[in-house]
Curated annotation (Swiss-Prot):
The antigen encoded by the PAG64 clone, normally expressed only on lymphocyte subsets and thymocytes, is found in increased concentrations in all transformed cells tested, in an embryonic carcinoma cell line, and in pluripotent embryonic cells. Activation of the gene appears to be a general feature of carcinogenesis in the mouse. The PAG64 clone, and related cDNA clones, have in common a repetitive sequence in their 3' transcription units that has characteristics of a transposable element. Gene3D superfamilies: Immunoglobulins (2.60.40.10), MHC class I-like antigen recognition-like (3.30.500.10). Keywords: Disulfide bond, Glycoprotein, Immunity, Membrane, MHC I, Phosphoprotein, Transmembrane, Transmembrane helix. The lineage of its organism: Eukaryota, Metazoa, Chordata, Craniata, Vertebrata. The keyword Transmembrane helix applies. It comes from Mus musculus. One of its GO terms (cellular component) is lumenal side of endoplasmic reticulum membrane. This is H-2 class I histocompatibility antigen, alpha chain. Involved in the presentation of foreign antigens to the immune system.
Amino acid sequence: RYEPRARWIEQEGPEYWERETRRAKGNEQSFRVDLRTALRYYNQSAGGSHTLQWMAGCDVESDGRLLRGYWQFAYDGCDYIALNEDLKTWTAADMAAQITRRKWEQAGAAERDRAYLEGECVEWLRRYLKNGNATLLRTDPPKAHVTHHRRPEGDVTLRCWALGFYPADITLTWQLNGEELTQEMELVETRPAGDGTFQKWASVVVPLGKEQKYTCHVEHEGLPEPLTLRWGKEEPPSSTKTNTVIIAVPVVLGAVVILGAVMAFVMKRRRNTGGKGGDYALAPVSQSSDMSLPDCKV
């Protein structure tokens, strides 16, 4: 059964949770069909573990107009098929996805998906923003610090942490004498912290004794001005020493909805009220993917 995970959505009535529960059960049945179809396309046995991911969502202008829509599928962590920015055509990642693309083109799937993105997706975003305005449109500035790690090679890794920020959009860069170290820098994707905020770090390898020449620069809309940090020039928060744990929360089935650069959150939506999943099956009439995940072999 669907249950609230944020206080602001608890105000939705019983009919909302009943409807979403029915839709989730319909999704489950549809995805079972999709997985069996994918197994057949890739000539795989029914044994073992396989994953089908779906993400749909809309970016909306401040005046409520649709800016960009997403409708994407991935199989076993790899791109499968995605609705393009024109919301009319598809990009298929491999030969199996080409089969799905042809079936969807024949069935007019892109037109139906575009109608959902331009209509229901935008309408629900407006409702969620109205109900959760104080939470969803807030800005939490990052807590930033630099950690120091000796390497067996004799040099040092400096890691710049940004923790507890919202929304997710943030910029971390390392500089040496005012020049950005884009090529030398390791940068992880922004990750959910599990408490409604986000985390990110960027690291650079530097010669021992030269640490003070390197500066980390942090830009976020929650900051009155960008931060500039050096190793040893600030105290890390007591709860986030060198052994800071980054938590990654995978989103398997949801729709990412963003208002400008201000707000991003995940909502689970489907156009249908459940059913057999015909509009979403990979076989006769299905939809899309574009997770841009590495090391995918098909």
